[in-house]
């Protein structure tokens, strides 16, 4: 295969990349949310390979491992596999959800039922915290957001769908300079521990942030749009980090800890799911012996230069935010980030030059209300005045003709 391998974690109840086809007449099968558009876009550049930590170690052939919305706990042994993968100078693309969304049973009275949001802890959080990054247990609400407009002219802001403008997107990278708008959904803010970042000599770069008119929803989460009200205290509004890129020689989380034992069930190699040569997840090649391990403990305690991209949502990967051609800002950002993590920054730069989406400038509420008022009231008044003017002209002309015949 001429394409580089891109690892995708298929264990731990991550978002399904490309589901197996369901039986043709099985109408009772539950609907499986998947990332089919992302799978199609990336399959032209990469060969997706499954990484199942319960079956096999992460192959050395991967340059980048994607972890999208895990919901099951990671054992210490599995965290060790991820930690040591990073120590080898590899990259992690982590799309981490802070809450598990539990939908209510459908019934005749549930049209207004709100899903229950429970805090989600998988163990991956402590690994990230060791590297100096934390994902907060809250959602970002933003006045700069998607607005649902009704046929009657009414507007309903969807605060948990922020629309990031050019000022909130890091423009220091050549592959992000032409991206002027990104849509987010149910994003948790991030925190950087500057003391750890400095002590480990890492570089943390903020890639995305909310607007200055954003706030956090924590505790009891309720995402019914008409129930969400902005805070009255202006001090609660502030821009907050939504995505970070951390680079450098990461220290191992297990340096001063007892090494976890390999589970017995991993002693016997089991085949991973293979979905065929259609750009979907395939079985990885067996891992080669690790020649980098030189420490007495049998692990790498200080890694080669690696990268972590971390964002507090997996919804940005879903089909409703991407296009099939890969020219939308959201698709462009994701493709470019994964290329950068995989050492293909030149491809990301070339792709970014083809960015054609240039949104019109945002109008202020006063301007929008003025235009609405003019359309509703101004235009009818103009028509009335025009009618009066035509009537007056006709009356004057009629009077002039009468005066001519009197002579």
Over which residues does each language-model region extend?
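Acidic, S/T/G-rich, low-cysteine, solvent-exposed domains in lumenal/extracellular/periplasmic regions
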Residues: 1-4, 10-11, 15-346
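Hydrophobic targeting/anchoring helices
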Residues: 1-40, 52, 344-407
């Amino acid at each position: 295969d001429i394409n580089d391998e891109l690892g995708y974690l298929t264990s731990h109840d991550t978002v399904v990349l490309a589901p197996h086809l369901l039986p043709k007449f099985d109408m009772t099968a539950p609907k499986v949310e998947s990332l089919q558009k992302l799978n199609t876009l990336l399959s032209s550049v990469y060969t997706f390979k499954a990484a199942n930590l319960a079956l096999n170690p992460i192959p050395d052939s991967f340059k980048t491992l994607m972890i999208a919305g895990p919901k099951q706990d990671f054992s210490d042994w599995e965290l060790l596999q991820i930690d040591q993968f990073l120590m080898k100078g590899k990259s992690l693309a982590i799309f981490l959800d802070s809450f598990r969304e539990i939908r209510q049973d459908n019934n005749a009275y549930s049209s207004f039922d709100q899903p229950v949001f429970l805090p989600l802890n998988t163990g991956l959080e402590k690994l990230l915290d060791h590297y100096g990054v934390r994902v907060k247990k809250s959602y970002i609400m933003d006045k700069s957001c998607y607005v649902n407009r009704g046929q009657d002219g009414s507007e309903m802001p969807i605060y948990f769908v922020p629309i990031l403008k050019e000022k909130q997107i890091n423009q220091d990278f050549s592959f992000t300079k032409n991206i002027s708008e990104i849509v987010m959904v149910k994003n948790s803010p991030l925190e950087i521990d500057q003391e750890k970042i400095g002590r480990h000599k890492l570089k943390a770069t903020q890639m995305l942030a909310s607007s200055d008119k954003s706030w956090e929803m924590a505790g009891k989460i309720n995402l019914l749009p008409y129930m969400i009200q902005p805070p009255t205290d202006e001090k609660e509004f502030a821009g907050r980090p939504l995505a970070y890129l951390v680079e450098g020689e990461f220290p191992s989380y297990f340096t001063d800890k007892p090494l976890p034992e390999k589970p017995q069930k991993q002693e016997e190699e089991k085949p991973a799911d293979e979905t065929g040569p259609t750009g979907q997840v395939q079985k990885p090649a067996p891992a080669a012996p690790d020649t980098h391990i030189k420490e007495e403990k049998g692990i790498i305690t200080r890694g080669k230069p690696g990268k972590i991209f971390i964002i507090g949502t997996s919804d940005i990967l879903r089909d409703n935010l991407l296009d099939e051609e890969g020219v939308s800002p959201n698709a462009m950002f994701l493709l470019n980030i994964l290329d950068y993590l995989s050492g293909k920054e030149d491809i990301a730069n070339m792709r970014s030059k083809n960015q054609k989406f240039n949104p019109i400038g945002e109008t202020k509420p006063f301007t929008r209300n003025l235009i609405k008022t003019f359309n509703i009231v101004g235009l009818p008044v103009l028509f009335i005045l025009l009618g009066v003017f035509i009537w007056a002209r006709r009356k004057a002309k009629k009077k002039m003709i009468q005066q001519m015949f009197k002579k």
